[in-house]
Amino acid sequence: MSEAPVLEDGFEFPGQSFSVAKADQVRKLTCSGIDPAIYGEAVDVAMLGLPTLRVLMACGLPILGGVHLSQRFRQKHAFLLEEEITISGRILEIAPHPRGCILKCAFEYARQDGTVCVEAVRSGISPIGPKEPSNGIPRPSEELDGFGEISR
């Protein structure tokens, strides 16, 4: 059994590949009251959330007991359903918190040719590390540049 990696600022998560199955996206969108036809053959960027959590879990980061603080996706190009996607990421910052630490990470989602289609920054309270007082939880920027509604 291998030793858990030392997690610190700059740590790079091992890359993983996955694809979003059309049936999964249709089921989840329908369950949420969203017409899957809005996305056609494109992947809804929200479908990238679970694979991101899998990257964290593969490095021994507990998901249970964590508190999601923020997540922002920047989509440059749409992925197609069933297309192979490679995710890579790194830790930007680890800050103390009474419940463990505030973990801020950046991720890139790329096509097989290396084209980065989506970038994400997420933060959350993770129940790891010394439980120390914090200087407050930093709020993400509320800048809305680049946001647009998908036509319905």
Give short role names for the model-derived ranges.
Residues M1, H77-R152:
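HotDog/MaoC-like acyl-thioester-processing domains
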Residues M1-S70, K131-R152:
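Hot-dog-fold acyl-thioester-processing enzymes
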Residues P36-Y39, Q75, A95:
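Short helix-to-loop capping/linker segments positioned immediately adjacent to catalytic or ligand/cofactor-binding
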